[in-house]
């Protein structure tokens, strides 16, 4: 289908204006208290015992952000109802109706839900920290259309700050090094480098690079960034590839035939291919490093092919959003979402529902080599 880049830019700008008006000149969102019915129990049972790894450190974007943008001047926020409608405690900043994929992974690892860097205090940091930030990318300029965000480089710097905090709590450098070496690092970056950089007409990158060159550029930066995390002590890394971005409601809304944009899907292929090669190279070149790749695109294809088996009925529109495919403007404050959220793949214009997040978490944790390569998260966590 033909993809209209100018429309994407227009709707992004329109969303920014709408959110600015909703937040008011003070920058504070005015909300009206209303009762929220108790959410159903999570699809993954929380194991409150000892985890099989000491901690989980999370880096990424809005797919796994859990509140780091709440208190920065940004249009990329989800700390308002109906976000969190199915989360115990309501909206937190997660871009979802409930749990994210890394929430499910944390539970499967036997860990508590990992706190956002902006809120982590005291002994909480000993079990892990989530540094992910909506609109963030591998490249520092990515997401500038949303103003505030925390790019990957800054997220790594924030991890360094956490290490300093942990040093005062766990017996010094030796104890830190041992704990960090045995901990898991989850990284999910890159989607905004396309959606909020390369595909935006007001960014120069599309005129500077073809799709292969841009994929090469991203992975060059990515390699350096992951090596920084390795040099800070990380050894067990889970790196998520990009999904079928041409099938998200925001992109579907730009076309006229209701089909996924193969132009966008093909655009991100060089990135995924390069990431797989990068992981192989890092495993070979960095002593004791153990990187694994999560094939998010393959997970999505399986969900689409077997939607009935998963209890899903709606693949082409968001549960909460405005306009065509409920994807032209993403979920706004106090908008009424669909009642049958467990039957939807997408919660809003860009992000999966809790149901799909937890399906993918289980696949990442215990799936075969078609979704987790060369081993899955459970196997990675169990390695000495």
Curated annotation (Swiss-Prot):
Enzyme class label: hydrolase
PANTHER family: GDSL-LIKE LIPASE/ACYLHYDROLASE-RELATED (PTHR45650), OS05G0419800 PROTEIN (PTHR45650:SF22)
Annotated Gene Ontology cellular component terms: extracellular region
Active site: 62 (nucleophile), 348, 351
Cysteine pairs bridged by disulfides in the record: none
Signal peptide: 1-27
Pfam families to which the protein is assigned, alphabetical: Lipase_GDSL
Record's protein name: GDSL esterase/lipase At1g71691
Organism of provenance: Arabidopsis thaliana (Mouse-ear cress)
A GO term, aspect molecular function: hydrolase activity, acting on ester bonds
Alphabetized Gene3D superfamilies for the sequence: SGNH hydrolase
Entry keyword annotation includes 4Fe-4S: no
EC number of this enzyme: 3.1.1.-
Single Gene Ontology BP annotation: lipid catabolic process
Subcellular location: Secreted
Keywords of the record: Hydrolase, Lipid degradation, Lipid metabolism, Secreted, Signal
TM stretches of this protein: none
Keyword field contains Lipid metabolism: yes
Lineage: Eukaryota, Viridiplantae, Streptophyta, Embryophyta, Tracheophyta
The organism's place on the tree of life at top rank: Eukaryota
Family note: Belongs to the 'GDSL' lipolytic enzyme family.
């Amino acid at each position: 289908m033909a993809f209209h880049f100018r429309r994407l830019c227009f709707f992004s700008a329109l969303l920014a204006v709408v959110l600015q008006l909703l937040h008011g000149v003070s920058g504070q969102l005015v909300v009206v208290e209303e009762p929220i019915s108790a959410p159903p129990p999570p699809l993954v049972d929380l194991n409150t015992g000892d985890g099989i790894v000491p901690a989980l450190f999370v880096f990424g974007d809005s797919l796994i952000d859990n509140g780091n943008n709440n208190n920065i001047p940004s249009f990329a926020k989800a700390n308002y109802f109906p976000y969190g409608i199915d989360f115990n405690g309501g909206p937190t900043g997660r871009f979802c109706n409930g749990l994210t994929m890394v929430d499910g992974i944390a539970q499967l690892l036997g860990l508590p839900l990992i706190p956002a860097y902006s809120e982590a205090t005291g002994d909480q940091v000993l079990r892990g920290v989530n540094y992910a930030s909506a609109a963030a990318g591998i490249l520092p300029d990515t997401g500038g259309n949303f103003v505030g965000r925390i790019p990957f480089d800054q997220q790594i710097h924030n991890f360094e700050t956490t290490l300093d905090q942990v040093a005062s709590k766990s017996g010094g450098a030796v104890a830190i090094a041992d704990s960090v070496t045995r901990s898991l690092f989850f990284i999910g970056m890159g989607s905004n480098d396309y959606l909020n950089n390369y595909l935006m007409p007001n960014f120069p990158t599309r005129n500077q690079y073809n799709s292969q060159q841009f994929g090469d550029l991203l992975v060059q930066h990515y390699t350096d960034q992951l090596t920084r995390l390795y040099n800070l002590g990380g050894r067990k890394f889970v790196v998520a590839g990009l999904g079928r971005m041409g099938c998200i409601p925001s992109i579907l809304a730009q076309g006229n035939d209701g089909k996924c944009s193969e132009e966008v899907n093909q655009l991100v292929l060089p990135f995924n291919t390069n990431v797989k090669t990068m992981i192989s190279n890092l495993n070979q070149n960095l002593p004791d490093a153990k990187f694994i790749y999560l094939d998010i695109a393959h997970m999505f294809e399986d969900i689409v092919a077997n939607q009935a088996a998963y209890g899903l009925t709606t693949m082409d529109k968001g549960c909460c959003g405005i306009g065509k495919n409920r994807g032209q403007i993403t979920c706004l404050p106090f908008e009424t979402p669909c009642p049958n959220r467990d039957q939807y793949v997408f919660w809003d214009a860009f992000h999966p529902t809790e149901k799909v997040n937890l399906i993918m978490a289980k696949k990442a944790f215990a799936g075969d080599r078609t979704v987790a390569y060369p081993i899955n998260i459970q196997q990675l966590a169990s390695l000495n």
